[in-house]
Structures are given as structure tokens and as C-alpha cells.
């Protein structure tokens, strides 16, 4: 069995075989010590005694089995070293056809690449190289002369411990060639972003989604390495009479892992749907805040909600786990802000797809807020990247069209005025534009959810006022001179207003103009 595991993938586990649950007779005395995890709930025996949890009556707890399966799926070696790294950022500067404007300058592409490296604890940029490349998809990425120059520079810098090739994906043969030529680990943008995600992910769901996103990377590694291992023999081409070569065995293990991850994520998706249903039942409007990574989404939500527990960080992908935060609009209507994962240019589609369960919350929002960091030189490219990604998520057209555009960090751009009508200039640090944003949010939320602001005349001695406090948002109660009635201003849904008129037909006149 140990040989079997070694044949699959270093650091990669074969699918577990579900353990048989043994029910021990009370008369049997175990000769080995046992450890009680929770009194009266689970006892773990020795390995020779059958292992695994022993439950009273032989009944399995499905939740424990689910957790065990999830824990197993989350066990995987890191994609990149966890220790200190001094990285050479190598950027292929692709020449554009004459007359075609580049999407971004090499300078800012390198700056973003360096920021990704520095987002990891203990990692630093030892050097940066911008090298012309006519065909970055070729085997060696660069032409013969440029490749020779790059090799000399990398080998001449003793401080470098690894090389970040700033391309979306590197073909396995290219990775092998470059690592052989330079004697260092070489990784691409996809691998680095996945590693950053791994380091920042906190919830089981985010970690599961990352494990699924890693499958193509592991599969390409299997396809590259296993052929060599087959040719080198491994003692025998076939393992334990299974009729499968190491390549086939490892590929099958990956297929099984992918299926199990998708099953677990679907289970987690179902739980998320239940949470959404509860929010709908309680009629909390939901506002999703989206934008490029490190554009200031979390800081903005903190300014809107006053939630001290939020801890914004000035680094890419500081937010990976979708979080929900309650806030009040000027009308005193309570809404929920959803802080989402930031987007990035040249982010592989399957990585976004892996986070579809998390980003599904965006599709069910009432209002979308698109935040753009206008202090960044590539603000327009970042904005286009976010819009392109949102369109790829197949969001409802009405939600996309009604999105509020927020230009953030305007305190870093003196005298800034939005170039397009409808955009809101906001600084979460100085407070500029926050009141205008709250007013715009309120108008959008009321419109999207069918709520309205009404002033109703109700009797103070009856149950009407108490009902309104429970079913609507009471903004103001103005007692009338007669003393037994009041004008009550409320934010109320059309459905709730219909129920109010049905319950109190005599005392519910038409709403007064507001």
C-alpha cells in the first residue's frame, strides 16, 4: 500500500476507503489506551483494533463523515515554498502590432507582479527583468539571443532563489526547460495566485474551491512527469496486477479527487442557498461590493458600516472568503454588504469557475457596487477586467445595468472629478462622498426591492404602530394635535403594505404624500 501511494504523486493521497464501523461489546476490554474526544460521543481506538470512530449503537453520524472527507481533501502539499524566497520577476514584453495600443505598460505589469510576490510572508523581489518577446507561448518564451542574456543575468545574481515568469500559464515542457537551464524553481502567474489564495483562505469552502482549481495544474504535472517514470521502470510497468501504469493510476486518482471535490462543493453550495433563503425570508436587502483586487472594497464597507472588526490590508487578495456585514441606510433600513474576492487581469477562467459557489452570492444581490481605484495608473484596464469577469458570471442584465460605479481613493488624486456622469467620487479615509453614496444606495435599494417611503396615519391606542415597528422600518412618529393619532413615516415593502391594509382596513387610509 505504501508503494501504491508513492506511485501516485509525492504528497498526493489516494482516495480513502471508507472504514468499517465496528461496534465493540461492552464486555470487551481494550488492552490499549483510548482517548475521549467528546464525552459520550466518540472514542478512538488503536490502529490495530480497527481504527476510526466507534459510535453507540453502530450508527454513523453523516456530519462527521462529511467533515472527515473534507479534511482529507484539504490535505495537500504547498504549490510553492513556504520559506523565505528572493524572487526574480521576469516579464516578457510582447510587441504589439503597429497601431495597436497595449492594454497596459510593462512598467505597471511588472509593478503588479512584484506586488503579488510581496503579498506572501517572507517573500521579496530580488530583481526585475523586462525582456522583449515575440512569441511568449514558445518553448523558451524568448528568442535565442534574449534567452541567453536572461540566463546569464539570472545565474549571475546569487541572491535569487526562484523565478516568477509573468505569464498566465506556462506549458509543462517550458517549465522543465527553464528550470533545467537556470537551476531554479520557475512558476507562472496562475501558480503564484493559487499559492497566495492558499495562504489567505480561511474558510473550508474557500480552501475546497482552491483544491478544485489546482486540479488542472496537478494534471499537467502528472502528464509531464509520469511518462518519464513509466520509461524509467519503477521496477515494473504495472502495479500490483492492477493493469495500470503509474501515469494511469495517478490520472485516475486525480479524476476521483476532482469528483469528490465537486460533490463536497455542491453540498456547501446547498448550505449557502439555505443561508440566502433565510436572508430573503427576513427581507434583508443585499448589496454586493465588487472590484479589482486591492481597490479598497473592505475599507469602503468598513466606512459604510462602522464595523471595527473589519481589518483591511493593503495587499492583493486580502479577501478570499465572502463575508457579510450589516449597515444602516439614511432611512434606517438595515442592509447587508457582501465583501467579495477581488478580480485580477490574466486570471485563468477555471480559477474564477472554481469560486462560482462563492460568487453566486453576487448574482442574488439586490444592488451591485463596482469599486475602481482611480489613484492607480491602470484604473481603466482594471475597470474593464472587472466588467469582463462579471459578464462571464452571467449575472442578471438588470443587476449589471443598475450597478453603482464608485471611484475610490480620491483623496490620493487632488481635485478629482469623475469623467463620467453617474459615477461617485469617494474616499473611505477622508469621508468624501460617503453621504452621497449612502443616498444613492438607498435609492437603488428601494427601487430594486420594491420598497417605498410612506407616511401613514394610525391610531396610537391600537396595534397598528406595533405592527409597523415589527414589519417595516419606522423612520418618524409625529403625534397629531388630537393626541390619539400620529403620522408615521415608514420604509415598507409593497407586500407588507398590502398586509397592513388587509389587517387594518378601517384605520389604513391611503398613504399621505411624502
Swiss-Prot record:
Transmembrane regions listed in the UniProt entry: none
Pfam families named in the record: GTP-bdg_M, GTP-bdg_N, MMR_HSR1
Sequence segments annotated as region (Disordered): 48-71
The keyword Acetylation appears for this protein: no
Entry keyword annotation includes Magnesium: yes
Matches recorded under InterPro entries: G_HFLX_dom, GTP-bd, GTP-bd_M, GTPase_HflX, GTPase_HflX_N, GTPase_HflX_N_sf, P-loop_NTPase
Protein's UniProt name: Putative GTP-binding protein 6
Gene this chain is encoded by: Gtpbp6
